[in-house]
Amino acid sequence: MTLDVSIIIPERVFWEKRVEEIILPTLSGQMGVLKDHIPILTGLDIGIILVRQKSSSDWTSLVVTGGFALINSNNVTILVNEAEFGSEINVEQAQISYNSSKHALEMNKDIKRKFELTLNLKKARARFQVTQLKK
C-alpha cells in the first residue's frame, strides 16, 4: 500500500502522485510519513518536502513556503502558498538570492522589517539547499 499525495497551491493542484514515503518540513521539525500513519493535521514551515515514489530509491524534492498538511487514511493533502520543484531551480540564482537575503537581514536595523527579511532568507535558504540535494 502507498500514500496518495496532493500538493495544492491557491491557483491549482500543483502535484498529485502515489508515493511510498514523504518527509515534511513541519513547524516543529521534519516529519516522515509512511503508509498507515496516524491521522494528523500539522503546520508546515518554509522548507523542503522530500518524496520517494513507489519502487524507487530516487527522491523528488520540492520547496514550499509554509502551509498545512492533513494526513488521514493514507492520503496526504498539502496546502501551501507556493511550491516549486527542486529540479527546476537554477543553482546560481538560488545562491545569489540566498547570499543577498542573508546580507539584507544582517544589515537591517528596522525591527519591523526583520520579520519579512527573515521569511525571505528562509525561502532563499530552502531554494539553495534543495539545489545541493541534486548533486
Swiss-Prot record:
One of its GO terms (molecular function) is ATP binding. SUPFAM superfamilies: Epsilon subunit of F1F0-ATP synthase N-terminal domain. Produces ATP from ADP in the presence of a proton gradient across the membrane. It is found in: Plastid, Chloroplast thylakoid membrane. Keywords: ATP synthesis, CF(1), Chloroplast, Hydrogen ion transport, Ion transport, Membrane, Plastid, Thylakoid, Transport. F-type ATPases have 2 components, CF(1) - the catalytic core - and CF(0) - the membrane proton channel. CF(1) has five subunits: alpha(3), beta(3), gamma(1), delta(1), epsilon(1). CF(0) has three main subunits: a, b and c. This is ATP synthase epsilon chain, chloroplastic. The keyword Plastid applies.
